[in-house]
Amino acid sequence: MTPVVVVGGVLTALGVVRSLASAGIPVYLACDTRFCPAGLSRQCTLLRVPDLEGQGLVDGLLSIAGRIGEKAVLILSSDVQVLAVSQARAALEAHYFLALPTKTMVDVLMDKAKFQAYAEEIGLRVPRAVVLDEGHDERALDVLSMPVVVKPVDRALVQAGVERTTRADTVAEARTVARRMRRATSSVVVQEWIDGDDDDMCFTLFVCDGQARIVALFTGRKMICDPPLVGSTAVCVAATEEHQALAAQTQAFVTRSHYHGIGGLEFKRHRRTGQVVVVEPTVGRADGQEEIATLCGVNIPAIAYRTALGLPVESVGAVDTAIAWRASFRYRPRAGTLPPGTRIVDGYFRRADPLPGVYSLYTYLRTSAPARLARRFVKQPRSRPAAEPIHEMQPSTIGG
C-alpha cells in the first residue's frame, strides 16, 4: 500500500496522523525531533529531517524518500512547509504525490495583502481592508471604520509566534500596532472588525481534485478561540446548519482559484447584520482543527490521500454532530454551550495513543504559572543547573 508522509510535529500533524492511521494507511512522520506531539504517537514511523522549513526541509524530504523506497503521498501542516514545497515541487514530484494549487496561486493566497486584492477581484465577500507598507502611509487607516484587526502580511510570522493578529479599537491604537508589526515584516493588513463572538466563526475543510472539483467538504463552527475572538481554535464542533451557505462560497472560491489539494476557508458572521464574510484561507495544508472532520465522519486527510493517488472516494455518510474537538484539556466550554450529550474529544489524550497526552500534560506543568512560581522559591543546586523549559507546541493560527 502506498505510504503517506506527514510533515511536522505539532497538534495539526498529530490529528492528521491519527486520521490516516484510522483508515489503515501506513504513515511516516517527517520531523526534526521525536519530542513533539506527533513524534510521540505510536501511529506513525518517525523519519528525521534537519529542518521543517526552507531548503533544509526540501533536502530532508529528498533524503527520506530514498529510505521509504517508493513514491509517497505528501501532506503538510504549516505555511512555511507549503512555501518550501511549492518552490521545490519540480525536484520533489519524482518522489512524492503532490496536490497543491499552482505556484502562482499559492503565492497569492498565502500573502494576506495579495489575497485581499484577489478576493475583491473575484467577488468573495471579505472585510474592507487596507495595506500599510512602504508605498501606503498610515493615512490609509482613515477610510476604515473602527475597530479593526491588524495582521502581518507574512502568515509564517503568526505561525512562528513572532506576531499575532491583534484588535485595535482606535486609529491611534491601530497605528501603534501596525508600527510594531512592521519592525518584523514590511507590510501589514488592517481589516475592519466583524462584530461577533467566537461561535460566530465557522470554517470549511475540503479536498479538491486536479480539476478543481470538491471531493469532500466539512463545515465546522468554532466555540472557543485562544486568545478570544482573534486566536486559534480551542474548541469546535460540526456546523451542519451552515453547510449549504458556506459550501456555496467555498465552491466559488475553489472554482475561481482552480484549487487543487487539501485546504480550508474561515468565515465570520456579523452578529448584527447576519452577513457572512471570508476571513482567510488555509492553503496547501491541513488545518489546526482538521481532526474534528474525521471524528464527525469526514476523514479529510484520508480522502486527500486517495484523491492524490487518483483512487475513487466513497460517499460520506451522515455527519455526527454530537462530538466536539478541543485543542487541550485547558479549554472547558461554559455550561450550556454544547448540546446535551456532546462528547468532547481532546486533541492530545487518547487511551490507545497515550504519549502525546503525557507530553501535553508535562509541558503544561513545566510552563504553567504555579510551576514557574514554585521554581522561583525552590533553590536550585549549583551543581545541577535547571533544565530548559519545554514549551508546549500550539496549533497553527491560520484558519484554525
Protein language model regions, located:
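ATP-binding N-terminal substructure of ATP-dependent carboxylate-amine bond-forming enzymes
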Residues: 1-101, 135-139, 370-398
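Active-site nucleotide/adenylate-binding loops and adjacent lid/helix of ATP-dependent enzymes
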Residues: 108-189, 198, 205, 210-213, ...
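Protein kinase-like catalytic core scaffold
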Residues: 148, 213-215, 275-280
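ATP-dependent carboxylate/phosphate-activation module, predominantly the ATP-grasp catalytic core
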Residues: 169-172, 192-258, 282-308
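A short glycine-rich, hydrophobically flanked beta-strand micro-motif that places a catalytic Asp/Glu
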Residues: 192, 260-272
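Active-site/pore-lining binding-face segments in mid-to-C-terminal subdomains
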Residues: 272-331
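Peripheral (often C-terminal) accessory segments that flank ATP-dependent C-N-forming ligase machineries
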Residues: 305-400
